[in-house]
Amino acid sequence: MSETGTGAAVADEAALVAGLRARRPDAFETMVRVYTPRLLAVARRLVGNDEDARDVVQDAMLSAYRSIDKFEAHSRVSTWLHRIVVNAGLMKLRTRRRKPEE
């Protein structure tokens, strides 16, 4: 799956979303493989370390999978996932602020 904006990429995204909605494990694996590198970079910039970034992306991927039926395709899957990662990262930062470092 590419993110070039071509017709093929749009068709790939539509197929991915259809697979996720059908709860096919291969579709989830594809989503993780294709989008994790970029999302990890976003999460690292937001939370500041690799361990928390991996947690954020994992939480975001599971959240996206569980709520794929809410995806309306007004934007690209990558945009939707980016927003979910940012929200998960902000939640991680809020949680971190509430807990003093031990």
Spans of model-derived segments:
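Intrinsic, short, N-terminal disordered tails of RNA polymerase sigma-factor systems
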Residues: 1-22, 26, 30-34, 97-98
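A short, glycine- and basic residue-enriched loop/turn
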Residues: 25-28, 36, 50, 54, ...
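Arg/Lys-rich amphipathic alpha helix in sigma70-family domain 2
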Residues: 69-73, 83-102
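Generic leucine side-chain signal with a strong bias for well-ordered alpha-helical environments
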Residues: 16, 20, 39, 46, ...
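Short, charged helix-capping/linker segments at alpha-helix termini
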Residues: 3-5, 21-30, 40-59
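Hydrophobic/aromatic residues within well-ordered alpha-helical segments
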Residues: 31-35, 39, 85
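Structural recognition of an alpha-helix C-terminal capping motif at a helix-to-coil junction
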Residues: 55-62, 66, 75-87
